[in-house]
UniProtKB/Swiss-Prot annotation:
<keyword id="KW-0934">Plastid</keyword>
<comment type="similarity">
    <text>Belongs to the universal ribosomal protein uL2 family.</text>
</comment>
<dbReference type="InterPro" id="IPR014726">
    <property type="entry name" value="Ribosomal_uL2_dom3"/>
</dbReference>
<dbReference type="InterPro" id="IPR022671">
    <property type="entry name" value="Ribosomal_uL2_CS"/>
</dbReference>
<dbReference type="GO" id="GO:0005762">
    <property type="term" value="C:mitochondrial large ribosomal subunit"/>
</dbReference>
<dbReference type="InterPro" id="IPR002171">
    <property type="entry name" value="Ribosomal_uL2"/>
</dbReference>
<feature type="region of interest" description="Disordered">
    <location>
        <begin position="225"/>
        <end position="254"/>
    </location>
</feature>
<dbReference type="GO" id="GO:0032543">
    <property type="term" value="P:mitochondrial translation"/>
</dbReference>
<keyword id="KW-0687">Ribonucleoprotein</keyword>
<dbReference type="InterPro" id="IPR014722">
    <property type="entry name" value="Rib_uL2_dom2"/>
</dbReference>
<dbReference type="GO" id="GO:0016740">
    <property type="term" value="F:transferase activity"/>
</dbReference>
<dbReference type="InterPro" id="IPR022666">
    <property type="entry name" value="Ribosomal_uL2_RNA-bd_dom"/>
</dbReference>
<dbReference type="Pfam" id="PF00181">
    <property type="entry name" value="Ribosomal_L2"/>
</dbReference>
<dbReference type="GO" id="GO:0019843">
    <property type="term" value="F:rRNA binding"/>
</dbReference>
<dbReference type="GO" id="GO:0009507">
    <property type="term" value="C:chloroplast"/>
</dbReference>
<dbReference type="InterPro" id="IPR008991">
    <property type="entry name" value="Translation_prot_SH3-like_sf"/>
</dbReference>
<keyword id="KW-0150">Chloroplast</keyword>
Length: 274
């Protein structure tokens, strides 16, 4: 991804940095509308998720996370922008006439061929079971449950690593640093997700943030005591507590929120790093 830096000709473009324009011309049979009503509110109209609202209308692109078109070669026809994720998507034309969207692997260009199945070449963009991959392979779009489709390492620039295979399980190191076990029969896609420079983007102004459906975030220390536990005081006062808390009084910044009795607790060999 090429980052385009704006000149400081106007306040709205000062310090702005966006990626190069990637057009989006989705196929009608691969998109459908979304019903965004409330934006962070429940059925009674009460805010349940803060900092959401507004935003441009979007059409959802149907992404093939399962990659269940086995042993049929497909060709990358377009690389498109997707407003629902940071990663780009590719339109694939398969040999049997079917057309599907997949996540854009890093380095893939228009005209490349991909395939999914067992014993397929270890090539960027190909999807195959973990049992057929050599150790050290960089992968993304990893299944947790066989046949459910990829659920791990799908964000822009995400990549996991296959570090061991023993018995019926494979050991993966995920982008978060977590090391966990997954069935060797689960599938994954070879390579890294594209658009790795997305973290270098700078929106440059508040209006661009509003287009994404994100409302302003206000610090609790500048609120009144009735609105936040950190609020109140004369001038720039400290929070008045030993440790920071959420707006509802629960400990924040460091407290573990994962449930202790999850089914996957025995599958995680090393928890993700902060």
């Amino acid at each position: 991804m090429a980052i385009h830096l704006y000149k400081t000709s106007t306040p709205s473009t000062r310090n702005g940095a966006v990626d190069s324009q990637v057009k989006s011309n989705p196929r009608n049979n691969l998109i459908y509308g979304q019903h965004h009503c409330g934006k962070g509110r429940n059925a009674r109209g009460i805010i349940t998720v803060r900092h959401r609202g507004g935003g441009h209308k979007r059409l959802y692109r149907k992404i093939d996370f399962r990659r269940n078109t086995k042993d049929i070669y497909g060709r990358i026809v377009t690389i498109e922008y997707d407003p629902n994720r940071n990663a780009y998507i590719c339109l694939i034309h398969y040999g049997d006439g079917e057309k599907r969207y997949i996540l854009h692997p890093r380095g893939a260009i228009i005209g490349d061929t991909i395939v999914s199945g067992t014993e397929v070449p270890i090539k960027m963009g190909n999807a195959l079971p973990l049992t057929d991959m050599p150790l050290g392979t960089a992968i993304h779009n990893i299944e947790i449950t066989l046949g459910k489709g990829g659920q791990l390492a799908r964000a822009a620039g995400a990549v996991a690593k296959l570090i061991a295979k023993e018995g019926k399980s494979a050991t993966l190191k995920l982008p978060s640093g977590e090391v966990r076990l997954i069935s060797k029969n689960c599938s994954a896609t070879v390579g890294q997700v594209g658009n790795v420079g997305v973290n270098q983007k700078s929106l440059g102004r508040a209006g661009s943030k509003c287009w994404l459906g994100k409302r302003p975030v206000v610090r609790g220390v500048v609120m009144n005591p009735v609105d936040h536990p950190h609020g109140g005081g004369e001038g720039r006062a400290p929070i008045g507590r030993k440790k920071p808390v959420t707006p509802w009084g629960y400990p924040a910044l460091g407290r573990r929120t994962r449930k202790r009795k999850k089914y996957s607790e025995t599958l995680i060999l090393r928890r993700r790093s902060k």
